[in-house]
């Protein structure tokens, strides 16, 4: 637009109104309205959780992350294919104001190192493998200090922000934390401490970094907020006329935009 020229404007519908709420607030409302309704089914793990059970597991995971030192604004990476732990971590990080970093399970060491460093990931949750990729061996390649890791604590020259490792598999090679450790550590965080953290949150807070496909260069981190994700879900639900009687099957990967949003 040239100086002094006509103004441009966009005219469209003003409704429905956007929701100014956090993901945790939306989950809490759903658990109150439909406590015995099924919230999550993970067939390959034999998991079936009601909304009440799911909210309880999310709170436990949130407390576990707080116990290992995850603060508001910290980046928590998850390097795994679709599983119960992925979904719990997604909602738990949102509940404590952390930012979930989605990491493509198919990444090689080069892409992994880039994503962890570029995002400033503080805590990484990871599985044992994906197809022919050995995740622990790949981490050792980009972060040799893993061999000296004690109780999940890490100091890395190549990844200066990375402080905690949580293994989602079995037969861990080093002194990493495992998923069950988070559940145990959660007992050290009171309900009041979790509520105080949640009271700090606003719907404009960033809660997710998704990486683009990187077809023209390195993947770029896209930041999403509570506002983005809650209202995206609202409009999808409205356009599909979804209700509490419907079930949604998500076969696509959680790490990218379709599965995550």
Regions found by a protein language model. Name each.
Residues 48-52, 198-231:
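Conserved AMP-binding A3 loop
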Residues 1-49, 53-68, 72, 112, ...:
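N-lobe entry segment of adenylate-forming
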Residues 62-63, 74-75, 81-101, 105-109, ...:
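A short helix-loop-beta submotif of the ANL/AMP-binding
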Residues 68, 96-184:
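Structural core segment of the AMP-binding/adenylate-forming
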């Amino acid at each position: 637009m040239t100086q002094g020229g006509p103004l441009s404007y966009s005219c469209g519908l003003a409704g429905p109104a956007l929701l100014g709420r956090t993901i945790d607030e939306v989950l809490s409302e759903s658990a109150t309205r439909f406590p015995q309704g099924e919230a999550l089914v993970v067939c390959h793990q034999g998991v079936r959780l009601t909304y009440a059970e799911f909210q309880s597991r999310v709170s436990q995971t949130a407390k576990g992350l707080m116990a290992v030192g995850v603060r508001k604004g910290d980046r928590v990476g998850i390097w795994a294919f679709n599983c119960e732990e992925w979904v719990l971590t997604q909602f738990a990080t949102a509940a404590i104001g952390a930012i979930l970093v989605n990491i493509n399970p198919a990444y090689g060491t080069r892409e992994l190192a880039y994503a962890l460093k570029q995002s400033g990931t503080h805590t990484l949750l990871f599985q044992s493998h994906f197809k022919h990729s050995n995740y622990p061996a790949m981490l050792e390649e980009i972060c040799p200090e893993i061999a000296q890791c004690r109780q999940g604590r890490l100091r890395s020259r190549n990844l200066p922000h990375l402080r905690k490792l949580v293994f989602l598999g079995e037969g861990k090679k080093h002194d990493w934390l495992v998923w069950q450790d988070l559940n145990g550590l959660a007992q050290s965080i009171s309900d009041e401490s979790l509520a105080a953290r949640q009271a700090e949150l606003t719907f404009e807070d960033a809660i997710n970094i998704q990486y683009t496909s990187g077809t023209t260069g390195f993947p770029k981190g896209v930041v999403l907020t509570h506002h983005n994700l809650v209202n995206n879900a609202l409009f999808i639900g409205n356009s599909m006329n979804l209700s509490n009687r419907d079930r949604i099957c998500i076969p696509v990967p959680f790490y990218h935009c379709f599965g995550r949003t």
